[in-house]
Amino acid sequence: EQFSADLIRDTFKVMLQMAMVLTYGAKVPVVKVGRMAGQFAKPRSAPTEVVGGMELPSYRGDIINELAFAPEARRPNPSKMLQAYTQAAATLNLLRAFSTGGYADVHQVHSWTLGFTESDQAKEYRDMARSISDALDFMTAAGLDSERAPSLQTVDFYTSHESLLLEYEEALTRLDSTSGKWLAGSGHMIWIGDRTRQPDGAHVEFCRGVQNPIGLKCGPTTTAEDLKVLMAKLNPENEAGRLTLIARFGAGKVGDHLPRLIKAVQQEGANVLWTCDAMHGNTIKSSSGYKTRPFESVLREVREFFAIHNAEGTVPGGVHFEMTGQDVTECTGGVRAVSDEDLSDRYHTACDPRLNASQSLELAFLVAEELTQRRVQTAAKTG
């Protein structure tokens, strides 16, 4: 029920809004990659869970077992992989229809964003929204409207997930008849999680053998030497666009870890794209007992990520958020000021807390401001 057509549409809609705001702020194209159509396996820190004295296998995602704490529900069920595949295929078909059928029209996307800025809580973002309106009006006056420029009605949208359940990934791997290389058919981009990035591990071995773009989560325990080995294994040809490093440290800790990893990349002359996962390092247990992520901590980590790249002379290439198009109350803060007491109202996640639609769009505006400032500073330095 969490993957109905309406919920997929709403998440896609918010991602389009975020991408438009970021494109305006950065003045460069934004590649849109959604953790959709395949994100059914969950990494867990412990193999079992104890409730009321009963110990059962941990919930590992709907592709393996069920969330309900009962022996039958927690028993791994291979048929769930077939169900996950069917769901992923249906989701991908729906995303294709949304991205090419007119739903993604740039003017419609901006009208949704204007609706967000009309609220009193979001009034600080109205100036940027109006500037985007002016830019679109100029394009129309210059003859670049949706009728005369059909590309304004469509977007390129890609899917991604953690390549965790190798039995599933291997079953969907195909030999590309054009290139003669292996291709992971479960998604456009796959990534290796912080728990499975051992250089001699099975997940690294699988990912290095496929030609898809690969993401690599880099956490506080990632050493410079391990990163060098992983870069050589995953991108031996040093190909542009092949390897994305996804930094996940937590607010207040980015400065302790990111600079040494940047230096390791520079020492190797490695061609990578740096992105910021500001979610996983900022998970806390609220006073009300719910696992949550404070909006302020997420924003702080993003700003630290940008500041360090500015100091190192490197490029911050992307942001990675766990989000939904639903009006959930799973992360605290934001323009609607979700509090600890509000979390129980609409806490729907089965695993990690997600940003809701307004929090996600607000973050996009704030990141766009960072991108604008960076662009202005760069222009000033180059004269």
Give the label of every model feature segment.
Residues 3-250, 293, 301, 318-322, ...:
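Active-site-facing alpha/beta catalytic cores
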